[in-house]
Amino acid sequence: MSTTSAINGNHYEQLHQGRTNMYKSKVNVVLGAQWGDEGKGKVVDMLASEVDIVCRCQGGNNAGHTVVANGTEFDFHLLPSGVVNEKCISVIGNGVVIHLPSLFDEVLKNEAKGLQQLENRLIISDRAHLVFDFHQQVDGMQEAEKGGKSLGTTKKGIGPAYSSKATRNGIRVGELLGDFNLFSEKFKSIVNTHLRLFPSIKVDVDAELARYKDYVDKVRPYVKDTICFLHTALRNGKTILVEGANAAMLDIDFGTYPYVTSSNCSIGGVLTGLGLPPQTIGEVIGVVKAYTTRVGDGPFPTEQLNEIGDLLQTRGFEIGVTTKRKRRCGWLDIPLLKYTSLVNGYTCICLTKLDILDTLPEIKVGVNYKRSNGEKLDHFPGTISELSDIEVEYAVLPGWQTSTEHIRNFKELPENAQNYVRFLESQLSVPVRWVGVGKGRESIINVH
């Protein structure tokens, strides 16, 4: 090797090492591994007591998280679940779309339950896009037009807001805090665009502008450049936790399209929704419910339209936090979990709501997908038509038929309950680190 090459090589190594060592801490991520409602909020609440910053990276108030802290039940839609920890900073990242009236309504409701000093603990990205009331009107109209082929949207305006973002006529939080005349011009322009496409929507432009002028001073204390804030925090060794909204099977790219949400709720959305490079990611925690649920329409291979589905729905109190709709229920689906693990790269799993299975004499787990001709699939179907042509092959495991609700040590769980957990581990080749057997954070068992 020439002297010049050696110098260049050493220079590269030094630069590479410098970049690698630039961050003194890692970002840990909590992601839903199914169709949402897995209990991510409770997991984040448990982990938030040990971190400095908790972030939301995508979605809007179409997501719903319930956290029980000190006997009080908090419902969050836009706020990260970490806000219940008063020592923690909560960040709403650039990938989130924000309906300001809903955000402040959520703040007031949770302050009434005891949440305090949010102004000092909540940061909103200046690059996050705004959801307006007309986005919500459009969402409802588009859903109604689909008739019997509706997608089951929450009608919160999330899809139309992301559409505005993609077509480059959306408005960001930072623009609201700048020159209000420019904001007004942009608002009138986006309203006119939507009126041309949807003439029946009702928008009082002057009233809306007056309302948003009032929001300027209310939202200003929360807003800053979250990208710079997070990178500075990592360089200073601050611990960061990201709370994914929705779940992998609702991802716009990897979910059961078109029965999906409008954002990337897999690992990629964490990076783009917060402005983080891949090397900052540490643990990726997949949250898996011990059975499967889904809100709204769309394919659901292991769904049980029988007494088992009814029992899971009743015992699990499967009602959507955001929609208040009953969730569809079915058995655990291994092919689905293998697929989302492939996409997200889970380093460990938190298995939730194991106690809901306590009364069952036997428990089925979907282990293979087969076509109607008997051929086994080695992949998760990419189209709805392909997915509708599959049959599920089940493994039957013995139940434990005793309450696990008050157990706090993994080795004290009934043997068959432990075997259920180990079966999931062996199928996915991913360790189960925690098991949930109740509502509160104290009901999460550390397996190891």
Curated annotation (Swiss-Prot):
Binding residues for GTP: 36-42, 64-66, 327, 353-355, 436-438
Cofactor note: Binds 1 Mg(2+) ion per subunit.
Pathway membership, UniProt: Purine metabolism; AMP biosynthesis via de novo pathway; AMP from IMP: step 1/2
GO biological process: 'de novo' AMP biosynthetic process; IMP metabolic process
Entry binding sites for substrate: 321-327
Recorded catalytic activity of this chain's protein: IMP + L-aspartate + GTP = N(6)-(1,2-dicarboxyethyl)-AMP + GDP + phosphate + 2 H(+)
Entry's Gene Ontology molecular function annotations: adenylosuccinate synthase activity; GTP binding; magnesium ion binding
Active site: 37 (proton acceptor), 65 (proton donor)
Pfam families listed in its UniProt record: Adenylsucc_synt
UniProt keyword annotations, A-Z: Cytoplasm, GTP-binding, Ligase, Magnesium, Metal-binding, Nucleotide-binding, Purine biosynthesis
Organism superkingdom: Eukaryota
Subunit record text: Homodimer.
Function comment: Plays an important role in the de novo pathway and in the salvage pathway of purine nucleotide biosynthesis. Catalyzes the first committed step in the biosynthesis of AMP from IMP.
Protein name per UniProt: Adenylosuccinate synthetase
Organism, as annotated: Drosophila mojavensis (Fruit fly)
